[in-house]
């Protein structure tokens, strides 16, 4: 009787081993589930970034507002007879490069 119980206990352990530690076991499934969740989160972040970039591309293609804004903030350009005022944070290092307006020399009178 004792031998039968030991054999049955050994069989139960052998049957449980692949369930917990095998190729398709619970631990592997749990790990893969966490990998799927992480990949979905990263995909959602990338989709949001792509939507933002797509919106910016459409704005650059269809309107002049975005081009003018980039010219002002990134290149320091302004339109003729326009005054552009930008308030900078004194604690933040500026990456803005100011380009002075061209010097127009008065025409000579003949």
Swiss-Prot record:
Subcellular location field: Cell inner membrane
GO biological process: one example: FtsZ-dependent cytokinesis
Alphabetical list of InterPro entries matching this protein: Cell_div_FtsB, FtsL/DivIC
Pfam families given in the database record: DivIC (PF04977)
Disulfide bonds: none
Keywords: Cell cycle, Cell division, Cell inner membrane, Cell membrane, Coiled coil, Membrane, Transmembrane, Transmembrane helix
Membrane topology: Single-pass type II membrane protein
Membrane-spanning intervals of the chain: 4-21
Topological domain ranges for the Cytoplasmic compartment: 1-3
One CC-aspect GO term: cell septum
Positions in coiled-coil regions: 31-64
Residue ranges annotated as Periplasmic topological domain: 22-110
Alphabetical list of NCBIfam families matching this protein: PRK00888.1 (NF002058)
Family: Belongs to the FtsB family.
PANTHER family tied to this protein: CELL DIVISION PROTEIN FTSB (PTHR37485:SF1)
UniProt function note: Essential cell division protein. May link together the upstream cell division proteins, which are predominantly cytoplasmic, with the downstream cell division proteins, which are predominantly periplasmic.
Oligomeric form and interacting partners: Part of a complex composed of FtsB, FtsL and FtsQ.
Protein name stated in the entry: Cell division protein FtsB
Annotated organism of origin: Janthinobacterium sp. (strain Marseille)
